[in-house]
Amino acid sequence: MDFMNVTKALTARGFKVSSFETAKEAAEYLNTQIDGATVGFGGSITLEELGLYALLSGHNTVFSHWHLPEGGDAAALRAQAATSEHYLLSANGIAETGEIINIDGAGNR
């Protein structure tokens, strides 16, 4: 797959594309771009490994059902996440045509 073709296709579909050499650079970029906002998380090992919940929750209101407070309501938390200003998830796949593929059991991607 040619990354430049993917970039062009995503841009044509209205996405802003940024790429990074390392996962740490990507996490730092998101941490500087999202500030003072509500942020919802879809269940994602990738986001966990990037440490984004810890980074963003220091200066945003973050909703993640993987970080459910004691006695919290997972369904209510997912609803809050879905209506956040920013919603972060990881895609299952992407086509060179710019189509993003998400398959999810809970429908939160």
Annotate each PLM feature.
Residues 1-109:
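The feature marks the mature, well-folded catalytic cores of soluble enzymes
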